[in-house]
Amino acid sequence: MTEAGFSPKVHRLRRPKRHHALLVAPSGEWLAAVDGQTLATQAHVDDAALWRAEAGGFRHVVCGVSLSSRAGRGAGSVRLNLGDAEIGAEGGPGPAADFVVGHGPEKRPSESLAAFRDTGWVALTCILAPEVVEGLQRLGGVDGHEGAGEIPRERQLATDPALARATVEPVSLWLCRQYMRLADIKLGHPPGVTALTPDDGERPVQGWHGDFPYMWGSDRSAGAYRVPPGADEGVLGIQRNICVSDFRLENGATVFCLASHGANAVPPAAWGRANQTWKAGHRAENGLPYGGEETDVIEAPAGTIILYDARIWHRAGVNRTNRRRGAVIQAITPGFIIPFYDTTAPFRSWLESDVPAQLDERERRELEELMLHRITGPQGVFAIAPDEALTERIRARGKAASASY
């Protein structure tokens, strides 16, 4: 558990030389060859929505259908033809609609899903468009915006559309839904950019744990985990790390034990669990949590999204540089899991801001689906939100849960 023993295996991701293109309809949905032939728009990005730019138009990556293109009426937009037929707003023949050429993934989503299912983690290298990355860096006060200061987390979603756009990135959400085998997924806490500041050699470093909702190794009370350790056919959590800055070994990239996928167990106590490393004096007495040959670090360029099964053991990295390193850390859970933090207040603030008007209908709809938990029953559908009076009653009776993450 000392710095001298820090020798993880480094998985280094290179910036892609090319990305697939997405053709975004006015609704925000994507033009797809849904059955290998028929063109239509759809609300998710899988292999059917991938295109390759070529001279004079676009060719479908899977079925090879070719579209000709010309400049659209909107800035940076295109209008499309399949043969002599103009492509309408819903993807079929109709009055020509303006499509926007979007920033797609490096690899086919089906390839990424196969890797995710095989190993419990996958990286979408530079999946976010450069302008979205720039907006996230501005919110977090990192990289080129380090001297400008950061926007407080509770205000970020209502300040810049980049955070919402990163949160509703379609390929990572499709992968989460496929990996969990359900459509209704939610955020476990509100989105926000955080910065890992340079290490001072003294402060606590978060130790080994599994993420929400499992929390294996995280709670103060030994064994008081949200989900009991052990094998379970269902997947209750995926962690989504968005690299706002480049993630490197020296600037505090997350330390994993990627081989722990499928272990269904709490991290070893000797490695330095999170429920111990937060305690005052622990670092001075024991050094840093384990980082030896059984561990891994994923180095990735800014704009990369790393998805991993929440049961994979991991711990915080240590920033040994003199610069802040930015990230968006998100827990993705099934809709029936109670969130880790309330997401309704930030969503309400977002609704009351001018940011929704800067997003398309698909982006607004997806963000609402991710942030609003619901009761659906015989009486109808209700949004779930904290009740102040009942919360005070619980706290007054000493029944509030206490945990350190």
Where are these regions (language model features)?
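Lectin-like carbohydrate-binding module/patch detector with strong preference for beta-trefoil
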Residues: M1-G104
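Residue-level detector of short, conserved catalytic/binding motifs and their immediate flanks
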Residues: E29, G56, V65, I238, ...
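A short, polar/proline- and glycine-enriched secondary-structure boundary/capping micro-motif
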Residues: L50-A53, G135, A265-P268, W350-S353
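Short, contiguous pre-domain boundary segments
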Residues: P95-V101, A115-V122
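Non-heme Fe(II)/2-oxoglutarate
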Residues: G102, I305-L307, R311-Y405
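Non-heme Fe(II) oxygenase catalytic core, chiefly the N-lobe of the double-stranded beta-helix
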Residues: S110-T119, L128-A302, R315-R323, I332-T344, ...
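Short hydrophobic-aromatic micro-motifs
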Residues: A123, I242, I306-Y308
